[in-house]
C-alpha cells in the first residue's frame, strides 16, 4: 500500500503545475501539493495548496494548516498567524485545531512574545480533550516561554514535569538538553549536588532508559552514601537498572552484596531470587536451586517464595527428580492460590503425572485446573488434556462429550482442531462449515455534523492513499462519540479500508456480528498479493505467512517491539542482515525493514530456513521464530517425546508456547475463511 501511495504521489509530482490552475480538480492539486510538502519542497507546494481553497474542498483545513506551517518556517509570522486564525475560525472541528494553537504559540515565541505564548499554551493544556502528543509539546514550549520570561527555575520545573509525566515522549530528550543548558547558564541556581536532586534525576534517567547516565549518578550516590540504609537504597536501584538493561554480569555482585550485607532487609529475598533467576537462565541449575532454597527457607513470608518454589520444582524436574518436583509444584498450588504462577504449577504437575503414565492422577489434576481456570489461560488446554489423559486410561466413550464440547466452542481455540482429530481417531467426524461469504455492507447511518466532518475527510484522504491521516480522522470520531450500533460498524469498515487492522479488530470485537463476519475483520487478507508472491517464491503456505504476521505485528508495517524487532514479520536487524547476505543482497537499514516488500522478502526466507532446519515441522519452526534456534535445539534434547502436541505443551517458555498455539489457530481460521481448496 505504501508503494501504491508512492506511485500516486509520483504521478502528481510529474504533472505540470499548469494542470492545477484555478478551476482544476482540487483533489489532484492537494495530492500534488502534499507530495511536494512531504518531499521538502514547500515553495512548489504553496501555490497548489492555495488553489484548493477556492470552493468547498473537503480538505481545505489541511491546506490552510500546511500553508501556516510553510509561512512559519519561512519566518513570515504575520502570514502564519493569519492562516491559523482562518483555520480556527472556519474549521473549529478540524483535526488540526490543537496543532494550530501550538503553532500560534510558536509564532509568539519566535517573536519573543513570551507572555502571550505562555497564555496560549496554558489555555491549551487545560483542555479536557487535548491529545497526549500535543500536551507534551505544549508543556515543553511552556517551559521555553518561562525561560524567556526570565524564570529559569520555573522553566526547569516544567521540564521535570514533562519528564515525569512522559518519560518516553519524543520531547523528553529535548527537555534534558534544555535543562543541561539552564544548569550551564545558571550554575548558581542549579548546584545539582543535593542527595535528593541527584536521586530524582537518576530515577528520571532510569525511567527514560538512559542507562549510562543513570548508572553514573547512581554510582556517585552509592559512593557518597552516608549510612547503611542509603547505601542499600542505591545498591537496589543500581542492580535494578542493570537488570532492566539485561546487564546481568554487572547486577550479580550488587545483588550478592545486598543478600550478604543486608540479610534483615526486605531487599534480601529479592536479591537472592534474582541471583537464582540469573543462574537459572544460564542453565546453572544446581547453583540456582541453592538460591531458590535460601529464599524458601530464610524468608518464608516474602513475596518471592511462590516463584522460588516454582523455580525449584522446575529444576527438580530438569534433573529427573519427579517426587521432589511434584511436591514443590503442589506446594505452589496449595499455599499460593492467588499466585501468578499457581496455574502454571498445576499444569506442570499434571504433566508430571501424564509423562509417568499415572493417567488417573493426570486426569484429576487437569480437570481441577480446567475448573479453576475455566475462562483463563489454561481453561481449554486443561480440558483437552483431561480428555487425552482419560482416553489413554481407556475411557474412550466418556471423553467424546468433552472433545465435542471443545470442537464446538468456536474456532478461536487452538484446541478445536485437536479435538476434531481426536473425534476422528475415535470413529466420529464433524463437518466443518463452508467458507463464509459476507452479506453486503449496510449503508451509512445518519450521523451528526461533527461526525460527518471527520468522516468525509477520512474518505477523501483514503482516496489519496493518505491512510495515516485518514485513520487520525477516524480516531477523532472514536474518541469524541463512543460509537455504538451501525456507527460502530461503519467505523470498523473505515478502519479496515485504511489498513488500520488493529483498530478494526478492536471495534469488531465490540460490534454485534456473526462469528464468521467478525473474523473477516479480525483475520484480514492484508498485503495478500505480496504474500502470495513470496509464498510462491519460497514454496510456503500463504496462510501460514498471514497467520504469523497477524501474531507478530497485526499487519502494522511500522511495528517496533521492545526488543527492537521491526516491521511486518518483526525481524531483528542481525537476523535480517544474516538472511540478506544469504540472498546476496545488501543488509537493510532499519528504515528499509519497515518496507513491506523488504520485510517479507527476508522474513519469509527466514521462516523457510527454519522449516528446512526442523524437517518442515511447523510447531518447532514457529517456536524457533519466537524464541530462537538455540532454545528449540535445547528443547529437542530435553523434551523426549514423538508426540508433537505434547512437545508444544512442554515448551518451557510460556510466551513461546502460547505463540505457537496462536499462530496455528490463526492459520486454521485463515484456511476456513478464505481457502477454496479445503
Please provide the spans of the model-predicted regions:
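Sec-dependent N-terminal signal peptides
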Residues: 6-14
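Short, flexible loop segments at boundaries between secondary-structure elements
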Residues: 656
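Short loop-to-helix capping motifs
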Residues: 616-617
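Acidic, polar-rich low-complexity tracts and alpha-helical solenoid repeat scaffolds
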Residues: 1-2, 12, 19-569, 573, ...
